Amino acid sequence: MTQNSLPSWSSLQTHYDKIRDAHMRDWFAPENDPAPTRAERFAFAGGGLAADFSKNRITEETLKLLVQVAREAGVEKRRDAMFAGDIVNPTEGRAVLHTALRATDPKAPFYAQVQAERKKMAVFADQVRSGEWKGYTGKRIRYVVNIGIGGSDLGPKMVVHALHHLATPEITTHFVSNVDGADLYNVMQQIDPEETLAIIVSKTFTTLETMTNARSLRDWFIEKGCPESALAKHFVGVSANPAEVVKFGIAKENVFEMWDWVGGRYSLWSAVGLSIMIAIGPKQFDELLAGANEMDQHFRDAPLEKNLPVLLGMIGIWYRNFFGSQSYLVAPYSQALHFLPSYLQQLEMESNGKSARLDGAMVDYPTAAVTWGEPGTNGQHAFFQMLHQGPTIVPIDFIAVLTPEHPLVSHHPKLLANCFAQSEALMVGRTLEEAKKVAGADKPELAPHLVFPGNRPTTTLLVDALTARSLGALIALYEHKVLVQGTVWNINSFDQWGVELGKILGKVVEADLTAPSADVKKHDSSTSALIARARAALKK
């Protein structure tokens, strides 16, 4: 099955040809927008979130056809298979059960196992938060350093920063991911080993970057006076390979388990989120899970026509596969969500950046768009120029938090006004005639530069307040969007073979950087020249 062979796909193409030149400005014109208004007709809600899809280049017929495509592609079947614990990651022969990590039904897959591990996490987190857990000199823990990369870093880091207003002031959480020593060294300058807990997170506990940083931090502890026998007070591990954690030197009782049926980029709900639980506490962590579970239930139970992940995913396909958009922007108007775009980059591009279909044939259509973003209003002063007047159409997801999580409440109307005004300006634009009036009769040559094409599509997601629950729902919304799109593209959203080749060659090149000249492997001329240049620099 390919998307092009779906019965509704050709109908959608015909529909696209019919409306592709229509301007949203005309759709919103009062004479064309009777009650119920376009805003009312394209407003949807689920999982505690609200979505305004009205400023997209869609009609009711568009949504009807997009939903038909989703249904014909088997979105419902694949969704149900995922929740049931069936194999939906066929290349690795695995179930995909991040939803089980937040399930409340005792009949859910691995329910008892998940609950037991979370209870262990909660006991430990409470000990650290209360000061009961002490370092080797008897001081309480005041610094937590999470060492991981990819899903072992991006999710926890995003959540801890987003919910900083809920975090205990007694503990500062740092995240180290890059194998560049500057990343770890910078954190070392800010912590005291006597008051530091390191959480080493790696599914295999063999990840190059993570283990390099873990060993360096362990050596630093010892250099600063921590006896090797006391390292158990300062190091814990999270892994699906407990034996390797113990081999590293972490005490068996300090090992928290994750499982191979949870992908890294979907793992913050597991023990991978231990740094989150220590920061915000077990009760708030449960709220995070509850919000995600609420979105899970919405995704599972709501009809496709009113299903937020389905609508968000299918509108993304509309722009990617029909309008030819190569990227889409995530613009959270919340500084607390600063790391959300980078988290979504991995979630979407590592999941759906694939060229091989499930049957092994190559796709002949675009898959994942480039995901990028920056919080508002910062982005307005960086790249919104291109969004408004550039020749490339970039769909945008605006995320607006309606009430602030901080005491500077007078700032918030300004923030929200900018968010809503940007969506309006991108939609309505400015015509040449309007631009001439702005330019004035004495500067007619300026008018073309003041034209805004408009008709730039945006979705606005509304969050009442940035709570652990609402954040959980927001994350789960995008998780399920990934499954929807991957199903329609007929690809495996849950493997990541694209990261493997670089790892393999990286080990060869690393050896070549320090090997005797006679042992350096043959590479292409470019790589060989780079290695030679680096070898010379490293000898200085």
Swiss-Prot record:
Keyword Isomerase listed? The answer is: yes
The molecular function terms of the Gene Ontology recorded here are: carbohydrate derivative binding; glucose-6-phosphate isomerase activity; monosaccharide binding
Active site at which residues?
E350 (proton donor), H381, K503
Provide the primary localization. Answer: cytoplasm
Alphabetical list of InterPro entries matching this protein: G6P_Isomerase, G6P_Isomerase_C, Phosphoglucose_isomerase_CS, SIS_dom_sf, SIS_PGI_1, SIS_PGI_2
Q: Which reaction does it catalyse?
A: alpha-D-glucose 6-phosphate = beta-D-fructose 6-phosphate
Any Gene Ontology CC annotation: cytosol
| Keywords attached to this entry | Cytoplasm, Gluconeogenesis, Glycolysis, Isomerase
Keyword NAD present in the record's keywords: the answer is no
EC numbers: 5.3.1.9
Please, one GO biological process term? glycolytic process
Q: Where in the cell is it found?
A: Cytoplasm
Q: Which family does it belong to?
A: Belongs to the GPI family.
Protein name in UniProt = Glucose-6-phosphate isomerase
Query: What is the species of this protein?
Result: Paraburkholderia phytofirmans (strain DSM 17436 / LMG 22146 / PsJN) (Burkholderia phytofirmans)
Give the gene that encodes this protein.
pgi
